[in-house]
């Protein structure tokens, strides 16, 4: 979607906050642990290239979801190691070698498909993915891991790492987490040669299970100042939210009692009211279920009245304000704050989704 810089709606990204969060997390993990920054999905909506450039001296490498995200970083001049976390198409192997990416290997079938097509694997670097209980991708049996490692090494592949991903590291109960950890450790113990890099720590594990860190961590949600558990667990130390979403009033009017707002006429004023229009809607990632949620104007909570439209919302103001008055949807305004987690709670979702859904139509500004 094409960015719309000629309207007041924008996402502000505090790059210094991201760097401080990395340093804060780094101070609470074992010395010498490698720090990999997860910048997939456009850095969780924060802007992959801008974020990666800002933090490249603070991390040891980057993690992305797919080959295209990795190419974007290389073409922007980023030279640090890049691990592609998802399963790549067979055709991506040549690109991985050309751009010096590290691929994830998650099954014997993928390896066999490469061998059947006689793909030259010499010089390729990979990490083996273990499905210890997440249930998405990865090896589940130690025998398959051993077979994969042997096959890859026989064909000139450097098996640099092995990793898993915890499903419940951000929850109160540790039972399933511990079961996953034991499955992963069992596979490691069965290997004739454990790869150089062993990593199982996503943001939640890095925050709440420091004792289980191997020799690398993958910093994702928390790096951007978000609590991976939402409101379930308190952060063990302070992190700074890096993202602010703001817009401005573009139309202000006084309406009489009985006036209706929005599609379906779902809101009817019960008295004379001041109603303002803000140019943001579900096409920007501000979803339809945000009706009745309050945004901030002049440090005051102002409810969204009527349904969220594709491009606009209407809000009820306590008084008349001039056009151009700032509206904060995520972030601080006066002495009040709206967090991505509060938005997520209202939507019955997670803060990851809230920031990832902010569309490319909204320009990102960095400071």
From Swiss-Prot:
Positions that bind substrate: 136, 310
GO annotation, cellular component aspect: cytosol
Keyword Isomerase: yes
Positions carrying N6-(pyridoxal phosphate)lysine: 40
Listed GO MF terms: alanine racemase activity; pyridoxal phosphate binding
Enzyme Commission number: 5.1.1.1
InterPro entries, sorted: Ala_racemase, Ala_racemase/Decarboxylase_C, Ala_racemase_C, Ala_racemase_N, Ala_racemase_pyridoxalP-BS, PLP-binding_barrel
Catalytic activity from the UniProt record: L-alanine = D-alanine
Single GO biological process annotation from the record: peptidoglycan biosynthetic process
Cofactor dependence: pyridoxal 5'-phosphate
CDD domains in the record: PLPDE_III_AR (cd00430)
Xref: SUPFAM superfamilies: Alanine racemase C-terminal domain-like, PLP-binding barrel
Pathway: Amino-acid biosynthesis; D-alanine biosynthesis; D-alanine from L-alanine: step 1/1
Active site: 40 (proton acceptor), 263 (proton acceptor)
Keywords: Isomerase, Pyridoxal phosphate
NCBIfam families: alr
Family to which this protein belongs: Belongs to the alanine racemase family.
PANTHER family: ALANINE RACEMASE (PTHR30511), ALANINE RACEMASE, CATABOLIC-RELATED (PTHR30511:SF0)
HAMAP family, alphabetized: Ala_racemase
Known role: Catalyzes the interconversion of L-alanine and D-alanine. May also act on other amino acids.
Name recorded for this polypeptide: Alanine racemase
Organism of origin: Streptococcus pneumoniae (strain Taiwan19F-14)
Gene: alr
